[in-house]
Amino acid sequence: MQKPQSQILEKDSLRVLRIALDKLESGFDTLPPLTSASKDGAGLESVLLQVADRLRDNYPYFHPLYAGQMLKPPHPVARLAYALAMWINPNNHALDGGRASSQMEKEAVAEIARMVGWNEHLGHLCGGGTMANLEALWVAGQVHPGLTIVASEQAHYTHKRISAALGLQFESLACDKKGRLDVDVLKRRLDQRGIGTVVATVGTTAIGSVDPVPKILELRKQYGFRLHIDAAYGGYFGLIDNLAAEARGSYDRLSEADSIVIDPHKHGLQPYGCGCVLFRDPAVGRFYKH
């Protein structure tokens, strides 16, 4: 009996991609015809086969049954749509770089914003969590110039590096026994003044801990700091219904943050690289004018 093969991309999916490519091409059929840049089909095949052979030297993170890596494979539809878009290679830096894809980006970002309870927001997609956090902390520095940013010792290491790159003071604070930001330590530091932004991590990459957002929000009422939530890894876990009560309590309060980072290329099942930065107050767009 022949052993069934494990397929990365089903042949039927490739057939659908071919149909979609034909439809895409028909939208530009008024352009002058061009001959192929390379008529050497054998040469092209040789190069692609070499690439395919070298790509086999990877762990099978892409397989849906692989449980030894924190990231999940892209959804088949996302993978095909990504390939389809690469044929026109849009650039959403401005409408002239990608008119249709910019509109689709706005729709996707709005869906992510609604996931955390925001109907009104400002945000966009970017290359990943590092760039998204950089932008959020840059805005935080504009809102509270000269004030310090704090995060837990379990927060992603890039917060410290980002703060240094932006010329902002940064401090790491101790965690409790569950790896969460210790709110008693945070309160003592707030009493010393000079804190402009608190970074709460909802799903640390090392141990999956969730900072106590409700307790941090109570401190915000007293001290008036800006709350940025790094949910690059953990953001999509808010959709599941079997979270522990403490974790659910934090997810249910995400909408009260000033800014949030979520990575669709993690548990949003999108291809690399796809991060998302969101701001609750669209007025921070004033910092983008140039």
Sequence positions of predicted segments:
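Active-site C-terminal subdomain of aminotransferase-like
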Residues: 243-290
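Short acidic, glycine/serine/threonine-rich loops at helix termini
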Residues: 135-138, 160-165, 208-212, 237-243, ...
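Active-site nucleophile and cofactor-binding loops and adjacent substrate-binding regions
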Residues: 97-101, 123-130, 151-153, 201
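PLP-dependent aminotransferase-like
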Residues: 144-193
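Active-site phosphate-binding strand-loop segment of PLP-dependent enzymes
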Residues: 183-228
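N-terminal entrance/gating region of PLP-dependent enzymes' catalytic architecture
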Residues: 1-119
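Conserved beta-loop-alpha segment that forms the PLP phosphate-binding cup at the N-terminus of a helix
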Residues: 104-110, 121-145, 158, 162
